[in-house]
Amino acid sequence: MLDLFGNEIIERAAGSNKIFTCLAASNHSGGDRQSEDYYATEPKAVQELLAVESFSDTILEPCVGGGHIAEVLKQNGHKVIAQDIIDRGYPGTIIRDFLTQLVNYNDIISNPPYVMAREFCEHALDISPEGVKVAMFLKLTFLESQERKAFFQKYPIKYLYVFSKRMNCAKNGEFEKYHSNAVAYGWFVWHPA
């Protein structure tokens, strides 16, 4: 049996109360999470963003990781300022905690650690002047929660691009090992005024 969203459901044995369980879940279980929350972005997700949004020539990628976003940006003619709090071997990475950066004058495209996504988005918007675009690749569940309600009231998104086919985020950038796309992601785009 399937629910309205196409998820398989299980019905409890006859003679008892019916309980339905959706078998869709996040592909990141608590004990299996990467310690620094490093899940690389499928390059196709960046190509899809660039097909619908234009960005300045120079882009800041504050969570560059292995360069999966940065490489697509470079292939499309952008100069990328690559930084991360950890050196994951991507050439030219500036080792810096983005949350301590005081100012930014470049468009930002990134997939921040989900456990700190609100902090990254808020900081990006706080340090970026009018005219700078901020695009963050986030789980659609980022739209939920009381804590983020105040955030969205203060920083309303301009566009939310939701994929018709789910994108993959690979733990430690190992796409050949991790093929799950159990989580729905989207590009959250702000145009600070």
Q: Language model features by range: what are they?
A:
Residues 1-193:
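Class I S-adenosyl-L-methionine-dependent methyltransferase catalytic core
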